[in-house]
Amino acid sequence: MKFIDEVKVFLKAGNGGDGCSSFRREKFVEFGGPDGGCGGDGGNVIFITDENLNTLLDYRHRVHLKAENGKPGRKSNKRGESGSDLVCKVPIGTQILTQDRVLLSDLEQPKQSFISAFGGKGGRGNATFKNSLNRAATEFTCGEPGEEKTVILNLKILADIGLIGLPNAGKSTFLSRCSNAKPKIADYPFSTLEPIVGIAKINNHEIVIADIPGIIEGAHKNLGLGVKFLKHIERCKALIYLIDGTEKDIYSVYTLLSNELSLYSKKLEIKEHFILITKSDLLGKDEVQEKCQYIREKTGKLTLHTGIDQELASSLKAAQKLVELHQPGNKSRGKYNPLEV
């Protein structure tokens, strides 16, 4: 399924039904009086989250969303039926923005809903205008028009851990080995063109891990795959910086990644993370230990290493600890020691 994380849609809520102007006509009733009913209200346009969705693909070509109009009032004081609401399902993590990118709602919870466009009120029938001075009222009102607006649906992935690294750093390989995800793996840059989510199981717990497409220098300026996917990192509780162990200067790679995230958003600069040296099976044991020690001393961050199947358990254990520290109500929250697993 193609991953679509932003679409623009036009919303049209239902119009209210017109009020009715009529008079009671019944045998032996000479002055029946007004009996026109009110019109029904127009339907609303509602967005609701669905746990089974992970893309906005359904709205790529379905750009006009229109709710049902209210029915007009009828004689005998019968109110018109209200129009049905249009309920649109979106993935968890969807933001609803105005055309000027002002946030209207952030749908982060399962079954969370938001009324994006309100239907118009039904018009009044002539029966509602009857009073002691106007016993044969003929006036009525038309229904109000429903709201019309254009909004932007912006999806930001909800994940516990985000995998950050340069192209070909081994993010997809790591995700495929520790979770149920099957990302494309190749020996050329940018084999991952869209975020991929997998679920890793450790100690009877599940951790949602997102593989973010490779970041290059200038990504915050829209170079490479640009800022399109950097937004998905914002919702991750913690990050893993994956650095290719065969790089000559692994600290410069760490600095590049850290700077790009910081330039995109200051919130990412303070997000908890640890470092994972990948492709360690291509290096000698002593060289691996030296590089881990070097980057640990330079950054003060926990540094682990992994190969094709090496050291997955310790990496996942560290990831699980980061996630647990960010759970609401955890008394240890904010007391993370970056040098402890």
Curated annotation (Swiss-Prot):
UniProt-listed Enzyme Commission number(s): 3.6.5.-
One of the GO biological process terms: ribosome biogenesis
UniProt GO molecular function: GTP binding; GTPase activity; magnesium ion binding
Cofactor: Mg(2+)
Gene Ontology cellular component list: cytoplasm
Residues binding Mg(2+): S172, T192
Localization (cell): Cytoplasm
Classification via Gene3D superfamilies: GTP1/OBG domain, P-loop containing nucleotide triphosphate hydrolases
CDD domains membership: Obg
TM ranges: none
Main EC class the enzyme belongs to: hydrolase
SUPFAM superfamilies per UniProt: Obg GTP-binding protein N-terminal domain, P-loop containing nucleoside triphosphate hydrolases
Domain OBG-type G: 159-341
Binding site for GTP: 165-172, 190-194, 211-214, 278-281, 306-308
Key words of the record: Cytoplasm, GTP-binding, Hydrolase, Magnesium, Metal-binding, Nucleotide-binding
Name of a matching Pfam family: MMR_HSR1
Obg domain boundaries: 1-158
Record flagged with keyword Hydrolase: yes
Family: Belongs to the TRAFAC class OBG-HflX-like GTPase superfamily. OBG GTPase family.
Described purpose of this protein according to its UniProt entry: An essential GTPase which binds GTP, GDP and possibly (p)ppGpp with moderate affinity, with high nucleotide exchange rates and a fairly low GTP hydrolysis rate. Plays a role in control of the cell cycle, stress response, ribosome biogenesis and in those bacteria that undergo differentiation, in morphogenesis control.
UniProt subunit comment: Monomer.
Protein name: GTPase Obg
Organism, scientific name: Neorickettsia sennetsu (strain ATCC VR-367 / Miyayama) (Ehrlichia sennetsu)
